[in-house]
Amino acid sequence: VDGVRRTWESTWSNPRDVLLLFDIDGTLLLKASREHAEALHAALRRIHLLEEIPTGKIEAAGRTDDAIARSILTLAGVPAERVDDRARDVRAMACAEYQHRCPADLRAHLAPGVPEVLDVLAARPDVDLALLTGNLDCIARLKVDRAGIGHHFPRGEGAFGSDSEDRTDLPEIARTRHGTARGEPPYPRERTVVIGDTPRDIACARADGCHVIAIATGPFRPSDLAGADVVVDMAREIPAALARIPGLA
């Protein structure tokens, strides 16, 4: 089956192009998650009538919003069936809460070099950009729009935490949407590069057979990101990193 799928994907009309899938928090934006966390916690309190949010043992880096919510609710003693039944309500409430809480201007939270490197990459005819993030889609779009970089990421493309609780599902979703938007099959995984700052970004790329560039601007050290094709320190190094991945040059 996988061989058939790879052959189908290889029929893309421009097989030398590259699809870059960008994470947001810790990659494009730094320290821009406080209001996001507050919105999710407020939604969990309101939907599940929680008095307190037990967050002390929850690791959020690289996880989807649904996965973070499930961990919090499990610690709070909410039955799994109820977590599933009210997940859609939590998403909707979190989006509404974030609309009220999101700062009007997030440009000060852009990681160094991000606006410039996105301009450079977007100007290349062989490169397409999209988002791949654990954020709910409504939250992700508001973040990049208010950071002044939303125009680089086409609406209706990419993949988000609202698409699947499991981050490893997201690259295939993003590749499929990219192809569908152009009347093509799913974009070839061997021409797709996930760009993120956590081991979970690396794991989701590898699960789908994609390349991955890790950027050490988040909470993890370069040694923690050694499973990537290339590890860089700054966003401005991404174009050079692409040239170092075999088969993409």
Model-assigned labels for residue ranges:
Residues 39-47, 90-101, 120:
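Generic non-transmembrane alpha-helical segments
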Residues 1-18, 81-83, 107, 115, ...:
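Asp-based, Mg2+/Mn2+-dependent phosphohydrolase catalytic module
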Residues 8, 21, 99-131:
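Short, acidic loop-to-helix structural element flanking the phosphoryl-transfer center
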Residues 71, 76-99:
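Active-site phosphate-binding/coordination module
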Residues 23, 130-132, 195, 215:
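Short hydrophobic segments within beta-strands
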Residues 57-61, 133, 162-163:
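Active-site nucleophile and cofactor-binding loops and adjacent substrate-binding regions
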